[in-house]
């Protein structure tokens, strides 16, 4: 379990500082947390994976909700970070949040989405409404749709050497 004791300089626990860094895109605060855990990398990963705000959002959820790509990029650089945490109530992943952010800032959202996919975010995870991130788009943003659909296709198809489909893509056409 990560340390939650209060730090002397801010009065906030390490988990609270992680959440604040993610919410405010505060790379300096995140780096100071990294420095204090320099000799304890496993504890740092545990802290990053377990830190939640009062509503259940992880640091990655908050980065994607607010478009805070600098902190997200720093977090994603660490091996062992869970890139698919699901919100305890909605089951939304950071990828769901990044897609929702695309309605505000499509270019920044695309960057967030591409980075999440690059490190292994699961484009097929569904929220409590049974929706994958791509299904949140509606008719908007073809670049983001193409990125998500390409990532899902890559998951569904074995390497070309084997050349066969692992499973069919989830689509509304299946019901017809």
PLM ranges: what are they?
Residues 10-18, 45-59, 85-102, 126-135:
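Ankyrin-repeat boundary/"N-cap" motif
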Residues 29, 70-71, 108-112, 143-144:
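Conserved ankyrin/ankyrin-like repeat signature
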Residues 50-79:
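Acidic (E/D-rich), amphipathic helical modules within compact regulatory domains
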Residues 1-49, 57, 65:
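Extreme N-terminal segments of fungal proteins
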Residues 1-20, 118-119, 128-176:
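Ankyrin-repeat-protein effector appendages
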Residues 3, 34-49, 73-83, 111-122, ...:
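Ankyrin repeat domain, specifically the short helix-to-loop turn at the C-terminus of the second helix
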């Amino acid at each position: 379990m990560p340390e939650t004791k209060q730090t002397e300089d801010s009065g906030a626990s390490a988990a609270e500082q992680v959440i604040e860094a993610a919410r405010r895109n505060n790379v300096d605060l995140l780096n100071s947390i990294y420095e204090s855990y320099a000799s304890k990398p496993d504890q740092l990963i545990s802290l990053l994976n377990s830190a939640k705000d009062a509503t259940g959002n992880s640091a990655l959820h908050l980065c994607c909700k607010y478009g805070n790509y600098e902190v997200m990029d720093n977090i994603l650089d660490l091996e062992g970070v869970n890139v698919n945490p699901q919100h305890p109530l909605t089951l939304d992943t950071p990828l769901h949040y990044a897609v929702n952010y695309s309605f505000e800032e499509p270019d920044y959202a695309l960057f967030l989405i591409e980075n999440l996919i690059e490190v292994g975010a699961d484009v097929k995870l569904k929220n409590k409404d049974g929706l994958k991130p791509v299904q949140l788009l509606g008719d908007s943003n073809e670049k983001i749709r193409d990125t998500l659909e390409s990532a899902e296709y890559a998951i569904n198809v074995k390497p070309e050497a084997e050349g066969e489909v692992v499973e069919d893509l989830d689509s509304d056409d299946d019901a017809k």
